[in-house]
Each structure stands twice: as C-alpha cells, then as structure tokens.
Amino acid sequence: MKKIYLDNAATTPVSPEILAAMEPYFTNKFGNASEPHFWGQEARKAIDEAREKIANFLGAKPKEIIFTSCATESINLAHKGLIESIKYQVSSIKYPHIITSRVEHKAVLETCKHLEKIGWVKVTYLPVDKYGIVDIKDIRQAIRPETVLVSIMYTNNEVGTIEPIGKIGRLIKEINVSRVACHLSPVYFHTDATQAIQYLDCNVDGLGIDLLSFSGHKLYAPKGIGALYIRSGVPFVRQQDGGGQEYNLRAGTENVPYIVALGKAIELVEQNKVHSTKCIEKLKSKLIDGVLKISGVKLVGHPTNQAPHIATFIVEGAEGEAMLLLLSDKGIAASSGSACTSGLLKPSHVLTAMGYKPQEAHGSLRFSLGKDTTLKEIDYVVKVLPEVIKKLRKMAPKLI
C-alpha cells in the first residue's frame, strides 16, 4: 500500500542533512556547554553558531534568541515572562491588558486564559472575518492605556490564512510614539510564526515584531526544540529557575544536538525557501483544483493571503474524523479541524470563529504539503478522495 504523508503542518520528518548534523553531538561531541574544558567549548561553539544562524535569518542579534523545547514553551515564556515583568515593575498598571484573536493556537489561548484565571491580566479576544483575518481597526480600537501585549499568529495552522503582521507591526509602532509622549508603557507585539517561518518573510525589524515563537519539528528538525526571539529592551522575567543559561532567561543544560538541528533547519530553509515554495504552491494548486471538483466541497481560508502548504476544505455530508480513518486505510495521512476531547467531538474553534456552523466544522479536512510531496501523490489523493466521501455520504443516513 502506498503511504502518502500530507500532514506536514502537524509535524515533519527529520531530514537526513539535519540528522547528520546532530549525530556527532550525541557521540563524540557530547560536552556540557557550561563547562570550560575542550568538550564544553566545543558544545558552546555549536550553540553559538546555531544561534547566529537563526539571528541572521530573523534580522536579529544572537543574544535575542532563546532556545526552548518547542513553540508552546516559547509562547508561554513570551506571554508570562513579559506580563510578570510589567506587573511588578510598572506599578501604575494593576491588570496588564493583552489583545489576541479567537483563532490563535491553543498555546496562546490557554496561556491567556491561565493568566486571566490567576487574576494577572485582562484579555480581549478579537473576532475574525470569514477568512480568519483580524481587522486592524479592531486592534486599534481595543488598545487601552493598560494594553501591553498584542499577540497575533502569522499563519493559521488550521486553515493557512496569513494575518497582516506587517500592518499590525506598523500600527503598534505608530501607537507607541504617542504612548511614550503620554508616559504610558509601550505595547509589545508577539507572533506565533510556527507555520510561517519556512515560507514567509520573518525579518523582525521589517515586520515590527518584539517577540516571535517557532518550533523545529515543522522545519524537518526533531520534536523537542524551539526558540523565542525577544527584542532587546523588552521587559522580561525568566519563568524557569536554575542556572544562568540562555542569557539567564531560560535555565537548564542546553540540548546541544537539538539546538544544532534547529540551526541546520534554518540554514536549509534559507537555502531552499524560494524553490521549495514554488514547487509546493504548484502541487497545492493541483490538489485544490481536483478536490473542488467533488460536489459539496468548499475551500476554507483566504483565497490569496494563504500559506503555500496548507489546503483546508469543508466537506458536506462527511465527518472529519471518519474521512481521516478511511483515508488512512488508503495510505493517506491528513488532518481535521475537529478534535476528540473528553469523549466529545468538539468543532474547531478556528472554523467556528470564522462563522462556520459546528456541523460544517465537523466536516473539515486539512491537507498540508511538504518538501517531499510529489505530483503522483497528489494525483492519487485526488483519485481516492471522491470514493471516500461517497462512501461516507452513503453511510450518513444510516447513522442518524
């Protein structure tokens, strides 16, 4: 049976080049980077080189890059580190105010909810339009004297919509000019760039970003490594106590092989971005054309402001999880916006925020392409999917 992996927005396989770069740091180059001897110096050099690669890619300084275990930790660190610092350093702000959107990754939404629950912050959750895009005007109107953080994802992981990050960055920069004149705390801008960093411009100065999170396992590096960019001057308190690693902002012995992997992943992104993006866009276009020939299927997300690798559909008369199981039987791995939680099938919070009814959201199907996706694989999916949908639609009346 053919095996076709179209769930690259969930995770990617580790590339051979990255695995080869990591391997020496599991065996011969095993030193602790905090030690002054040869092995420690060797490990420290590897970390410094990886940090510099990532900093150069983002247009940042090496000391502004903090290594974490994943994007979720990076997001938690960004929000909690900033809020705790402001809460205890700016006495005039009793409840720091965060602005985010209803379509963020759960790492952002649950972190904000936690900070609300413990009484540290007030949060505004902005609506989105039918494409999943936040209105710049809504951000402007939501900003108040206590606002300290705007956190909007760069590219949505479920539907691929690209948010107007550059425009948001310029808006915040403009607002901060007047806030400084009024002796108010600046508003800082965080973005979750996990789905964007492989394909889109992530220059932090050009976009006006103060904090940026991403993960390695979406870049063909292993699970267990991520990073947080923190602009110099952003108030910040570490959330993990211990040694002074990561510029005293994230304690713990550095995971050298995985840091090397992340540096190598970014190096490969920089080398291959243009070619890879063009190839994936062509394959995605063919996939969309083929899938939309099926009756009762519609494409979700913005028609043009869209990540090159994600294509999400809503299929009338077919449930997402059931489609995944039947596709898996055919050797195809995909994803759905619905997730099984506590025995109850809950519709995607992203799709419902975009205005889709729960029943529609349950019929979502996401294909996410990668560098190894081929034309033959797309042709096979386009051939098999109509059969799967037809089978489920025939079964549907019997299940009611």
Whereabouts are the PLM-identified features?
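Pyridoxal 5′-phosphate
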Residues: 1-400
